Amino acid sequence: MLIFRQLFDPQSSTYSYLLGDARACEAVLIDPVFEQARRDAALISELGVKLVATLETHVHADHVTGAWLLQRQLGSAITLSAASGAEGADRYLAHGDRVKFGRRYLEVRATPGHTQGCVTYVLDDESMAFTGDCLLIRGSGRADFQQGDPRAMYRSVRSQILTLPPACLLYPAHDYRGLTVTSVGEERRYNPRLGGEIGESDFVGYMNNLGLPHPKLIDIAVPANLRCGHPEKDAALPVEPGWAPLTFTFAGIWEIQPDALEENAANIQIVDVREPDEYHGPLGRIHGAKLIPLGVLAARTGELARDRPVVAVCRSGARSAQASILLQHAGFNDVANLAGGMLRWRAEGHAVEGGQA
């Protein structure tokens, strides 16, 4: 079975794509974003797959790649086009190469035009392709910087992408209107820049008169991406919480396991967000836990110290996850949710006050 997830970075409107072989438990990630690396690593962990490689469709100008961060955390190989000009990759790709994950693979098609090193990745059965910034949904990427060439882009799209089967689904690196997927058949017919009977000279004339401003992050993103996302020597690396062993979930929440909470409880504020009848009910409560029901937590955050870590607790971990987000938005920096809540706490034999034996 193929694992497929389309992931989104709202800051840069970038799509990243996770593809995996469920039976072999191997996966690849196309166009990871630096700020989303923690999220992506959490998803990969939850799906139980090994990330064997990150793949870039090109050297991006609007965001920094998460390739190096993911390699640092998960050991994945950094992979991109040999024509990209980037340094520090583990594998440089050429037209016709294959990137394997389990029994599946992506075929590399050189599609220069947006940049000189653009590639499109085509799944082995040609059911889907990942077009980067070369072909967008009812549009195309720009071709006015980073060795861009509108003639090359036109030829790339016409010869390497729109020659795929009509039913082949196309997934771009960006969309700014909330669109998520298109198909070869649709783009052949409806793409106003590259579809139908539009000729090369028509496309070149259109692209040469776009007059677009350069991406805001180009002076940061391009140099960083030419290093495959590796930070400069004096740059600060993302800091993991050091007050307890925590796990970052795909839901965007830090979780603490019962054993870790028990071991570090002396330095932690525990806030129980259940209702009073639950707090005094059969499950009991953790020693020292302060009762502040979720419904009134926003109004009572002043009762919690901001210079000490906070762990939110409820029956199962659902309400306390919401409480964790609320506290983060209220300016608390060190917040975690008790994984599994009081149900798991008791099931694992940790001490409680009150409750039924």
Predicted features along the sequence, with ranges:
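Catalytic cysteine-centered active loop of the rhodanese-like fold, especially the PTP/DSP P-loop
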Residues: L294-A347
